[in-house]
Each structure stands twice: as structure tokens, then as C-alpha cells.
């Protein structure tokens, strides 16, 4: 049985549960409210653990000026404190009137991620641009939203950075190709944005996780035995590694590594590289300071 067949069968059986997790309803019972509070505490503990780990790592000798779109979401809110801890200067784009809570040490600028004309003039003097904008809680029913938000915001960011000659563009994409058709629109939009990056000749790092494990996103731990078997079998190994699970901590460290090691041309960071970022980050810093 091929990895495609296994994933298609498994995906069909888990699709309903997957999208119930990704699209939780507003809390309507005490149990729902308690679960939200538990998730919030778990997120705080996870953030503290990650911060302590980062504190133990050597710092880069060069501070970056980083501009972030989508910085108030699940990934961005975990990434920003880590970049600040590592002495990078962070400027975050937020919607006008947004009450998003961001660390006091970062600079907040207002603009619309769907229209680069509202923020192009405040990107500089940043040398690194991280694009994290995406429709929250993605599901197959949100194909139109992926094109209206993910595609448009990506196109605007890519265009603005190409015009400004941005030193390094970092794009959070998704692992592909993938056999599961349930997220084909989501994957297609990110593949198109990757193509735009290539066409505009940006110096870019494209990061391709599949599913990110973290607070409120832990049910796929149940799939780990399945993944281990598929990674062990020669005929399913490549697909299992490409579409493997990564933790929020691993993804944040991969983003930090990308920030601190700009590239000429295009670099694609897949699941295996994301998983090894915690090991590679100290080595890269040692190499830079040697």
C-alpha cells in the first residue's frame, strides 16, 4: 500500500474530527470555557519553556530589523518574543484600530495586509520580512477565503519586497505535494505564492510545515505511531517525512534560524529541516562568529 493510499484512507476517517478541532465553536458550556482556560495556561507554559530554551542558545552576532505581517496569530505571537529576546528589532503590521496585545519592545504600525500601499512606506529600514498572514482555522470550506486573504496578502507582500529590494523574505508555506485533497485549495494558494517569489527573484526562505503541534493543537499526537511506521518503511518514508508533524517550538526555532542566516536565492525548509533547527541554530551561529 502506498503512502498516498494510506494517507487518503486515514484522512477520510479523520476529516470530521480534524475540522472540529480547527474550527471550534464559541464556548457555550462551562466545560468549553474551562477548556479554553486550560489551553491558555498550556500556551503560557509552552511560551515560557521555549523562551528558556532560547536563552540557553548563543546569540547571533548581527541584529536584524524584522518586519512581520500576521504577527498577532498563533505562530507570530510565539515568534515575536523570541526574536526580541535574541536582540532583533521587530516591527509588526496590525490592522487599524486593532487591540492586539504585543510585547512593548516591538514597534507596531497600522496597515492593511491586503493592500501594500498602506504599509509599503513603513517597511524600511527592515532588512528581513516575515509573511505569516493566513485565514485562521483553515478548512476545505474556506477556499474562497484562502484566495481573498492568503493569496492577496502574499501577492502584496511579495510585490512590495521586490520593489524595495528586500534583503531577505521569509514565507510560511505548507508541505506539498500532499495526497490529501481535503486541503487542496489551501495548498494551491501557497504553491502559487511560492511561484511568485521565484518570478520576482527574491532572496527568500520558504518554510513548509504540515501540521504544527502545540497548545490547542495536540490531537495529531495520536498519529505518531502511524508516522513512525511510515518513516521506517522504504516505500512510504519520503512522503511521511515530507508530511510529518512538527512542534510549535521546532517551527519557531526554524523561523529564527532563517532570520539569522539570510540566503542568496531561494531556500526551501521542509519538515526534516524544521525538526533539526534546534540543533542547527547553534552551529550556524558558531560558523558566523568563527
Regions picked out by a protein language model, each given a short descriptive name:
Residues 2, 6-65, 281-290:
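Non-catalytic terminal and boundary segments that flank Rossmann-like NAD(P)-dependent oxidoreductase
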Residues 58-86:
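N-terminal Rossmann NAD(P)H-binding glycine-rich loop of SDR-like oxidoreductase domains
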Residues 69, 93, 132-133, 169-175, ...:
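SDR active-site strand-loop-helix element
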Residues 98-156, 160-163, 178:
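NAD(P)H-binding glycine-rich loop region in Rossmannoid oxidoreductase-like domains
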Residues 149, 153-154, 189, 219-221, ...:
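Substrate-positioning beta->alpha
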Residues 173, 195-218:
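Conserved beta-loop-beta element that borders a ligand/cofactor-binding pocket
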Residues 215-238:
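NAD(P)-dependent short-chain dehydrogenase/reductase
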Residues 243, 247-249, 253-285:
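Core catalytic loop region at the nicotinamide-binding pocket of NAD(P)H-dependent oxidoreductases
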Amino acid at each position: 500500500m502506498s503512502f498516498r493510499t494510506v494517507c487518503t484512507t486515514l484522512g477520510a476517517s479523520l476529516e470530521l474530527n480534524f475540522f472540529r478541532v480547527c474550527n471550534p465553536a464559541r464556548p457555550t458550556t462551562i466545560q468549553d470555557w474551562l477548556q479554553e482556560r486550560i489551553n491558555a495556561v498550556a500556551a503560557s507554559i509552552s511560551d515560557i519553556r521555549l523562551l528558556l530554551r532560547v536563552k540557553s542558545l548563543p546569540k547571533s552576532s548581527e541584529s536584524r530589523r524584522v518586519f512581520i505581517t500576521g504577527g498577532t496569530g498563533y505562530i507570530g505571537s510565539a515568534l515575536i518574543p523570541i526574536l526580541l529576546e535574541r536582540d532583533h528589532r521587530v516591527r509588526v503590521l496590525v490592522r487599524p484600530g486593532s487591540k492586539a496585545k504585543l510585547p512593548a519592545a516591538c514597534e507596531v504600525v497600522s496597515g492593511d495586509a491586503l493592500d501594500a500601499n498602506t504599509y509599503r512606506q513603513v517597511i524600511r529600514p527592515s532588512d528581513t520580512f516575515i509573511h505569516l498572514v493566513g485565514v485562521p482555522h483553515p478548512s476545505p470550506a474556506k477556499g474562497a477565503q484562502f484566495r481573498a486573504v492568503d493569496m492577496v496578502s502574499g501577492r502584496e507582500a511579495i510585490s512590495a519586497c521586490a520593489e524595495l529590494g528586500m534583503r531577505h523574505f521569509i514565507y510560511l508555506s505548507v508541505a506539498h505535494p500532499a495526497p490529501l485533497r481535503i486541503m487542496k485549495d489551501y495548498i494551491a494558494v501557497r504553491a502559487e505564492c511560492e511561484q511568485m517569489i521565484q518570478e520576482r527573484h527574491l532572496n527568500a526562505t520558504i518554510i513548509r510545515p504540515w501540521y504544527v503541534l502545540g497548545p490547542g493543537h495536540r490531537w495529531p499526537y495520536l498519529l505518531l505511531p502511524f508516522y513512525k511506521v511510515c518513516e521506517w518503511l522504504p516505500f512510504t518514508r519520503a512522503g511521511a517525512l515530507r508530511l510529518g508533524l512538527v512542534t510549535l517550538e521546532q517551527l519557531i526555532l526554524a523561523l529564527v534560524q532563517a532570520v539569522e542566516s539570510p540566503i542568496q536565492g531561494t531556500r526551501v525548509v521542509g519538515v526534516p529541516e524544521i525538526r533539526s533547527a534546534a540543533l542547527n541554530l547553534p552551529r550556524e551561529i558558531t560558523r558566523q562568529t568563527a
